[in-house]
């Protein structure tokens, strides 16, 4: 990009959603940029096998989870579940918690969250900054431990809490069905051939994938999971060894690619160094899956437009092993 073209973009030739004034921060959720990943890719990936990523860190809460958080809140309000004196509660690995805390602050609704104690310090501090109450659960139990903790609390105080239950709430995947999938189709002008996404609750891949399959049933929907039950890829679940999210249907996927923690970390760092895209480890996992897929297409002499989701930015992981001092 030339200096002139860069300045022209800054002066107003960028996309319409970023030019409009907004009455509330919540109206900035969605309509995130789609950017091509190129410079960090291995040399054996040809130009006609494209990899594109939705930069979900551009959401006001900093992650893809702003979409389902807002959707679940609005659904609960519409159904009359959130009333004066009620507290919204859920289990989270971090990003949904941040998003729920943000939405709660914007709407004036108190929020309580449970999450594993070993998540990054940044996530804990951001949640508290939004005014939410935080419970820390056994890190060895992962998000499953947080889920069980919340269930017990809700069972004990049913009149106090509105349990959004992101792992089983249809409003989660519908957020992507009515936003992310449409955005990707429009941004690629219908050229997308493969959609790749990490699996946590399953909301992103189920909602986006369902929408894309309506547009074009030939689009391949590919899930990304950690290779092992004990892993360091925050936000992703090893489904076989975890409490399976009720909204996730593995039979819907065309395939699943398993990623090791070290590869996820490596490619997250490469994205920052070479493409200037600063993301977390789940984005590194998604990219590594895309690279493996791109290599398969290249070997068969096929073209492709692979689109993935980079769930969040790297700011929340600066104190973790992801960005510890490495060359």
UniProtKB/Swiss-Prot annotation:
The keyword Lipoprotein does not apply. Pyridoxal 5'-phosphate binds at residues 95, 200-204, 282. It catalyses: O-acetyl-L-serine + hydrogen sulfide = L-cysteine + acetate. InterPro entries: Cys_synth, Cys_Synth/Cystath_Beta-Synth, CysM, P-phosphate_BS, TrpB-like_PALP, TrpB-like_PALP_sf. The modification N6-(pyridoxal phosphate)lysine is found at residue 65. GO terms for biological process: cysteine biosynthetic process; cysteine biosynthetic process from serine. GO terms for molecular function: cysteine synthase activity. It is an enzyme of class 2 (transferase). The keyword Transferase applies. Pathway: Amino-acid biosynthesis; L-cysteine biosynthesis; L-cysteine from L-serine: step 2/2. Keywords: Amino-acid biosynthesis, Cysteine biosynthesis, Pyridoxal phosphate, Transferase. Its EC number is 2.5.1.47. One of its GO terms (cellular component) is cytoplasm. Disulfide bonds: none annotated. SUPFAM superfamilies: Tryptophan synthase beta subunit-like PLP-dependent enzymes. NCBIfam families: cysKM, cysM. Belongs to the cysteine synthase/cystathionine beta-synthase family. This is Cysteine synthase.
């Amino acid at each position: 990009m030339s200096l002139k073209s860069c300045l022209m973009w800054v002066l107003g030739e960028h996309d319409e959603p970023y030019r409009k004034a907004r009455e509330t921060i919540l109206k900035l959720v969605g309509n995130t940029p789609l950017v091509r990943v190129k410079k960090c890719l291995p040399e054996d990936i040809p130009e006609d096998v494209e990899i594109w990523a939705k930069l979900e860190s551009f959401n006001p809460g900093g992650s893809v989870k702003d979409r389902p958080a807002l959707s679940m809140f609005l659904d609960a309000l519409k159904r009359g579940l959130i009333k004066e004196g009620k507290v919204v509660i859920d289990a989270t690995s971090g990003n949904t918690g941040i998003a729920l805390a943000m939405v709660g602050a914007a709407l004036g609704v108190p929020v309580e969250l449970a999450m594993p104690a070993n998540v990054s310090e940044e996530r804990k501090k951001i949640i508290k900054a939004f005014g939410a109450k935080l419970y820390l659960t056994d890190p060895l139990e992962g998000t499953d431990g947080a889920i069980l903790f919340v269930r017990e609390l809700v069972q004990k105080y049913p009149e106090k809490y509105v349990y959004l239950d992101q792992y089983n709430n249809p409003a989660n995947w519908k957020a992507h069905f009515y936003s992310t999938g449409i955005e990707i189709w429009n941004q690629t002008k219908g050229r997308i051939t493969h959609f790749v996404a990490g699996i946590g609750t399953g909301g992103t891949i189920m909602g986006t994938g369902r929408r894309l399959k309506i547009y074009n049933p030939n689009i391949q929907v590919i899930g990304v999971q950690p290779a092992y039950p004990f892993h360091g890829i925050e936000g992703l679940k090893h489904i076989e060894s975890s409490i399976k999210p009720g909204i996730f249907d593995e039979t819907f996927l065309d395939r699943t690619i398993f990623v090791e923690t070290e590869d996820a970390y490596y490619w997250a760092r490469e994205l920052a160094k070479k493409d200037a895209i600063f993301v977390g480890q789940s984005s590194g996992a998604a990219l590594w899956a895309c690279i493996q897929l791109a290599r398969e297409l290249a070997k068969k002499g096929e073209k492709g437009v692979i689109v993935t989701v980079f769930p969040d930015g790297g700011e929340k992981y600066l104190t973790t092993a992801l960005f510890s001092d490495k060359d």
